[in-house]
Amino acid sequence: MKVAVVAVQGAVEEHESILEAAGERIGEDVEVVWARYPEDLEDVDAVVIPGGESTTIGRLMERHDLVKPLLELAESDTPILGTCAGMVILAREVVPQAHPGTEVEIEQPLLGLMDVRVVRNAFGRQRESFEVDIEIEGLEDRFRAVFIRAPAVDEVLSDDVKVLAEYGDYIVAVEQDHLLATAFHPELTDDPRLHAYFLEKV
């Protein structure tokens, strides 16, 4: 199984390690490639868009000509996982934390693949980084979620979206067909269950 991690910014090495562990968990050999250019996305079975700064990642994805091949992969039902900033990149709509509930356009490149509205930095400056055990549908035991200046979903825009996890007033993990997004960083734990759940979509 060949999995590409978009490697323009973010926790690429951490995703590589946890993907390999997830592969072992489900009995699959996982080859991880770092995707910086379109040719790196050829013949991949799944894609991960990691955390980082969503505006920067989006602009770098455009500069490296990754947007079109990513959209083509999505159209062909290739599984895509977005974590933290990756959730923002996958969202159809994004609003700033300062104005939740308002239709403020964010000037940043988005793939717009998931029918959700995401609030950037949803938990505010006072809770920029924290860890909490949450329940995730599809996983038997609670999962240690690491939030770092995390976004969150404040509105689901389609019945096609399945809510997998909530924390406080927000939705923090969603699934739509072959797409999966989390507000937290599952790659910053040693628990491969969420990545294994993702790989089982291949």
UniProtKB/Swiss-Prot annotation:
One of its GO terms (molecular function) is glutaminase activity. The active site is at C84 (nucleophile), H185 (charge relay system), E187 (charge relay system). GO terms for cellular component: cytosol; glutaminase complex. The keyword Lyase applies. SUPFAM superfamilies: Class I glutamine amidotransferase-like. Its EC number is 4.3.3.6, 3.5.1.2. L-glutamine binds at G52, E53, S54, R120, I148, R149. Belongs to the glutaminase PdxT/SNO family. This is Pyridoxal 5'-phosphate synthase subunit PdxT. The gene is pdxT.
